[in-house]
Amino acid sequence: MTKYIFVTGGVVSSLGKGITAASLGRLLKNRGLNVTIQKFDPYINVDPGTMSPYQHGEVFVTDDGAETDLDLGHYERFIDINLNKYSNVTTGKIYSAVIRKERRGDYLGGTVQVIPHITNEIKERVFRAGRETNADVVITEIGGTVGDIESLPFLEAIRQIKSDVGRENVMYIHCTLVPYIKAAGEMKTKPTQHSVKELRSLGIQPNVIVVRTEMPMPQEMKEKIALFCDIDPKAVIEARDADTLYAVPLMLQEQKLDQIVCEHLRLNCREADMTEWKALVEKVRNLSKTTKIALVGKYVELPDAYISVVEALRHAGYAFDTDIDIQWINAEHVTRDNVADLLKDADGILVPGGFGDRGVEGKIEAIRYAREQRVPFLGICLGMQLASIEFARHVVGLSGAHSSEFDPNTPHPIIDLLPEQKDVEDLGGTLRLGLYPCKLQEGTLAYAAYGDEVIYERHRHRYEFNNQYRPIMEEHGFVFSGTSPDGRLVEVIELKDHPWFVAAQFHPEFTSRPTRPQPLFREFVRASLKE
């Protein structure tokens, strides 16, 4: 029988529900259980694919091409599993599915209502996650905060699941905040009490309360929360701010969260062996070297927009006992005149993906600097396209070379729409998305990084290198080191006369893991260390 764990949040958003869910997933996996995990987002967008990163942070892409919440990146990195389109569900997806069924006549003329039709659709997404993966445990994080009107159908659905599958097969974990009032020198439990009261008014009694706090919580405070919220004092789990995200599973294990979960759900399984994870955390806390990586992007005020890139850099750093000092460079501020000053301290330069023309010329200047000054460079998606444009303009001499995305009238469309995208009108869900094969050329930096001829990476793009320009670019030392197996699509480019200059059309950051760094990031950091 599959077991179901629901993680909710109260008091404020951004409490770390996703990290809590991911950490618990890691602990249960290390107990020998087959775990899957999903995120329910209460917004009406079908997916975050067309949302601004300022609104939502990074869009994380799964193997099967779903554009999803950034929490799925945490889930994959912590639990070391590959998720799919069933792992991110939004209100928009639920209502779209129900309306489609109504139009098809599936409800036989009945009145379609939030209960039971919307809630049944939500429950089906929970059960499907377990069926598709044969999971022992399905962990579902409910986005938003208890009390928000948007979350109500999701909370009602997870309340009903207890009756559907039996209370011994369902567990509710509620994440709250105990704020520290500096002026009074006190921590306050009242917001937690009210949040749990709100949850209980909706018919959900939490089994565990995970409390975010800046300061250590005295035992009597845990007992007070337990008394007012009607749970065992041992089930009040303190989640203090950690020096590294990867320490959170160990913090939760110390307080026996995984044991509490297994006892409640009647799961007979071994103790979690966290030896390798402890070694990782020990390594992260004692890095002896530092390298400076300039990340040149347009959303640098919000690091969450590049969270998988940042984590992939850190993972690569761990492999070399190196702390990555990221220098956030706003591409809009980069010009020909100031680029040397802005990037003079960088040991490596990275230009990540993005959409829209804001900051494009600044990124091109940063790429030119990396090429001319022989600074290790990694370009991702748009970064690869702009590296091609920079080379075409300044080495090949194709004046006005650009992407037709930014300049439809460019005389040299180095980057152009994929042929299959020419007649596409909708923006949402229509990109080239998900895992595709790439064939690497022997003797190249990319081949050296992967050590394999055919690799698989995740994509999210609509534009592609224009093959008409391949011959002239190659004549000038531009290397097409990776293509689709049929040779039609350019996937990886590099430069002949440069120590380490590689750019990929795909998104390598999505497949990096803390104990298994992604090959391009690993070699980029190695080159940046000047070893």
From Swiss-Prot:
GO molecular function, one term: metal ion binding
Limits of the Glutamine amidotransferase type-1 domain: 292-531
Binding site for CTP: 13, 148-150, 188-193, 224
The protein's Enzyme Commission number: 6.3.4.2
Cellular-component GO terms for this entry: cytosol
Binding site for L-glutamine: 54, 354, 382-385, 405, 462
Catalytic activity, reaction form: UTP + L-glutamine + ATP + H2O = CTP + L-glutamate + ADP + phosphate + 2 H(+); L-glutamine + H2O = L-glutamate + NH4(+); UTP + NH4(+) + ATP = CTP + ADP + phosphate + 2 H(+)
Binding site for UTP: 13, 188-193, 224
Family matches, as InterPro entries: Class_I_gatase-like (IPR029062), CTP_synthase (IPR004468), CTP_synthase_N (IPR017456), GATASE (IPR017926), GATase1_CTP_Synthase (IPR033828), P-loop_NTPase (IPR027417)
Binding positions for ATP per the UniProt entry: 14-19, 71, 240-242
Coiled coil: none
Keyword field: ATP-binding, Glutamine amidotransferase, Ligase, Magnesium, Metal-binding, Nucleotide-binding, Pyrimidine biosynthesis
Regulation: Allosterically activated by GTP, when glutamine is the substrate; GTP has no effect on the reaction when ammonia is the substrate. The allosteric effector GTP functions by stabilizing the protein conformation that binds the tetrahedral intermediate(s) formed during glutamine hydrolysis. Inhibited by the product CTP, via allosteric rather than competitive inhibition.
Residues passing through the membrane, by range: none
Swiss-Prot/TrEMBL GO biological process terms: 'de novo' CTP biosynthetic process; pyrimidine nucleobase biosynthetic process
Annotated positions binding Mg(2+): 71, 141
Recorded metabolic or biological pathway in which this protein acts: Pyrimidine metabolism; CTP biosynthesis via de novo pathway; CTP from UDP: step 2/2
SUPFAM superfamilies on file: Class I glutamine amidotransferase-like (SSF52317), P-loop containing nucleoside triphosphate hydrolases (SSF52540)
NCBIfam families: PRK05380.1, PyrG
Sequence similarity: Belongs to the CTP synthase family.
Subunit structure: Homotetramer.
More about this protein: CTPSs have evolved a hybrid strategy for distinguishing between UTP and CTP. The overlapping regions of the product feedback inhibitory and substrate sites recognize a common feature in both compounds, the triphosphate moiety. To differentiate isosteric substrate and product pyrimidine rings, an additional pocket far from the expected kinase/ligase catalytic site, specifically recognizes the cytosine and ribose portions of the product inhibitor.
Record's protein name: CTP synthase
Organism name: Geobacillus kaustophilus (strain HTA426)
Gene transcribed to yield this protein: pyrG
